[in-house]
Amino acid sequence: MSMTDPIADFLTRIRNANMVRHESLEVPASKIKRDIAEILKREGFIRNVEYIDDDKQGIIRVFLKYGKDNQRVISGLKRISKPGLRSYVKADAVPKVLNGLGIAIISTSEGVVTDKEARAKKIGGEVLAYVW
């Protein structure tokens, strides 16, 4: 069975594991999921990312991050550009999430970057998701 939207599936798995406070989760690997996971790690939303080679496409293991008193670090994830309705922005219209408290993940000609990096490089692209 083919998956229509693997990015939405990845974000949903993170959201669900986060809601029940799991320590980690595993998803089938792809380059875009790996790039998104690296951005989430770099921005401090997740603790760590591991890549496991299973002689097929591989597996990405994501270790979730929680604050004091087991508070969630990720309070929300939202898929923006969907297969049925793509969402593109120009360099001067890159969105801010919660006035800069969250991040927008954008797929550009220079790879997958955050909204801050896209503004700094003055490039637009496809808005994949918001994380806050």
UniProtKB/Swiss-Prot annotation:
The answer to whether keyword Membrane applies is no
Instruction: Output one GO MF annotation.
Output: rRNA binding
Which PROSITE patterns does the UniProt record give?
RIBOSOMAL_S8
State whether keyword NAD applies: no
The biological processes this protein is annotated with in GO are:
translation
Q: Give the UniProt keywords, A-Z.
A: Ribonucleoprotein, Ribosomal protein, RNA-binding, rRNA-binding
Source organism superkingdom? Bacteria
Q: Name one GO cellular component term.
A: ribosome
HAMAP family linked: Ribosomal_uS8_B
Share what the entry says about its subunit structure, partners included: Part of the 30S ribosomal subunit. Contacts proteins S5 and S12.
Q: What does this protein do?
A: One of the primary rRNA binding proteins, it binds directly to 16S rRNA central domain where it helps coordinate assembly of the platform of the 30S subunit.
Q: Which family does it belong to?
A: Belongs to the universal ribosomal protein uS8 family.
* Protein name (Swiss-Prot/TrEMBL): Small ribosomal subunit protein uS8
Gene that this polypeptide is encoded by: rpsH
